[in-house]
Amino acid sequence: MKTLLVIKDDCLNSLMAVNWAKRELKEFEIVDINESPEVAMVYGVVDIPTLLKVNQHGMVDRVSGYNADLYNKLMEDGING
């Protein structure tokens, strides 16, 4: 499973999230919404960092951060039909 930290590079919250991830996570990749604006459109990430867990099939398995409850419910509804 891959962990993605979605940030906005000029945001103080993002700096704090990156520092937290460096301390707490073994491996993660940073996705800057300024470089990948489609991520912001898909996940609604604007100014608040969001942590995504992506499985081996490229599907988002878990979401933490902004609107996490909404995304997790949408994913659960999609899985359970």
Name each model-derived stretch.
Residues 6-8, 25-39, 47:
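Thiol-based oxidoreductase modules, predominantly thioredoxin-like and allied folds used
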Residues 4-5, 51-52, 74:
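Generic leucine side-chain signal with a strong bias for well-ordered alpha-helical environments
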